[in-house]
Regions:
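Cysteine-centered iron-sulfur cluster-binding motifs in ferredoxin-type domains/subunits
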Residues: 1, 159-171
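FMN-binding flavodoxin-like domain, especially the glycine-rich phosphate-binding loop
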Residues: 1-158
Length: 171
């Protein structure tokens, strides 16, 4: 979903993997004039603790940030407010938030084929609205997002075990 959003900005994104424990992680360098698309998967209404831990190593430098919670057609619950809190605590200006519905990572029958053409159009529309907001010159005000504080308790597992047909898609 974040790739579709970035297409709307006509920019090639610099991506950093924060969710896979086996992936090496080097915090990206963020400048104050950058626009950061912070996209995370949602599992049981929360974002991955490893992603948050790694993200906290980034120096935000006051950069603008769009948060994208990608969920598998069930619910995103507290993910947006959790992402907002983490990003704000790090020094980002959270200027927009998107809850993006995608194919479920385990039960593929939910959200099958997503993102699709309609999702691509919607993300392009979001990109246009975000650009207008950035060019408008008005100060950014904190967003009021759905979710609970304190967040619901996180959970672990069950985790699927891949067989030799795994393509390392990351889901």
């Amino acid at each position: 979903m974040s790739e579709l959003l970035c297409q709307g900005f006509n920019q090639k994104p610099l991506t950093t993997e924060t969710c896979r424990p086996e992936a090496a992680y080097t915090p990206p360098v963020i400048e104050a004039e950058d626009l950061v698309i912070l996209s995370m998967p949602v599992y049981a209404g929360r974002v991955p603790a490893l992603a948050v831990e790694r993200l906290r190593k980034v120096e935000a430098n006051g950069a603008r940030c769009v948060i994208v919670a990608v969920y598998g057609n069930r619910a995103y619950e507290d993910a947006l407010v959790e992402m907002q809190d983490v990003a704000t605590d790090m020094g980002f200006q959270v200027i927009a938030a998107i809850a993006a519905n995608a194919e479920h990572s385990i039960c593929r029958m939910y959200g099958t084929g997503r993102p699709d053409e309609a999702d691509a159009k919607e993300m392009a529309s979001f990109a246009e609205a975000i650009l207008r907001k950035m060019q408008g010159g008005t100060p950014f005000v904190p967003l009021t997002l759905p979710g609970n504080r304190p967040y619901k308790q996180g959970c672990t597992g069950p985790f699927p075990v891949a067989d030799d047909q795994c393509t390392d898609c990351g889901t």
